[in-house]
């Protein structure tokens, strides 16, 4: 997910997206542990997407306070 796409989301949508990504990350870790994971690079992609969502959510919260 690109940063521009994330910036277009509202605060509630960001929370939903973050929850979805964390669930996906959990499932990927579980697949890795059981040897069923096909694309190991997806773990890093999801981790970076989570960071993107958290960063933009924090920026939006700071803008709202200012």
Curated annotation (Swiss-Prot):
Keywords (A to Z) from UniProt: Ribonucleoprotein, Ribosomal protein
Pfam families: Ribosomal_L29
GO biological process, one term: translation
Matching InterPro entries: Ribosomal_protein_uL29 (IPR050063), Ribosomal_uL29 (IPR001854), Ribosomal_uL29_CS (IPR018254), Ribosomal_uL29_sf (IPR036049)
GO CC, alphabetical: cytosolic large ribosomal subunit
PROSITE patterns associated with the record: RIBOSOMAL_L29
Keyword Ribosomal protein carried by entry: yes
Coiled coil: none
UniProt entry tagged with the keyword Ribosomal protein: yes
MF GO annotations: structural constituent of ribosome
HAMAP family hit by this protein: Ribosomal_uL29 (MF_00374)
Protein family per UniProt: Belongs to the universal ribosomal protein uL29 family.
Name under which the protein is recorded: Large ribosomal subunit protein uL29
Lineage start: Bacteria, Pseudomonadati, Pseudomonadota, Alphaproteobacteria, Hyphomicrobiales
């Amino acid at each position: 997910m690109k940063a521009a796409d994330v910036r277009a989301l509202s605060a509630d949508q960001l929370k939903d997206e973050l929850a979805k990504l964390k669930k996906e990350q959990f499932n990927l870790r579980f697949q890795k542990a059981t040897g069923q994971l096909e694309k190991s690079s997806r773990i890093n992609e999801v981790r970076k997407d989570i960071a993107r969502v958290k960063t933009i959510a924090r920026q939006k919260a700071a803008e709202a306070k200012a």
